[in-house]
Amino acid sequence: MESVRKAFKEATEKYGCVDILVNNAGISENTSFMDYTEETFDKVIDLNVKGVFNTTRVAAECMVTRGKGVILSTSSMVSTSGQPNGVAYPASKFAVNGLTVSLARELERV
């Protein structure tokens, strides 16, 4: 989270508050479920879910203060259909969907 805060601090000092945030990062591992390790699972979840959470949390601070802003999060069709050989990716994108919809409902009136 500190690296995200630092990057946003530098950007806002130079350019001002963030108007639009696009969460578009993601990784997947092409590994069968039986060969999946907790480390591999955590790597995908950390980037795909925690990355969205951390970046959105910092960007939203400025947006809420100003009373405006747009947050877009890309996901994937496999978030609802699943995919073999990469269970963490669809799970992470399902989590991004839930995070984004919940955040939209919470912040729509702020």
Give the label of every model feature segment.
Residues 25-29:
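Conserved NAD(P)H cofactor-binding loop of Rossmann-fold oxidoreductase domains
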Residues 34, 81-87, 109-110:
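Active-site loop immediately N-terminal to the catalytic Tyr-X3-Lys motif
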Residues 56, 92:
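Active-site helix of classical SDR
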Residues 61, 105-109:
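Alpha-helical segment proximal to the catalytic Tyr-Lys
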Residues 76:
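Residue(s) in the substrate-gating loop at a strand-loop-helix junction
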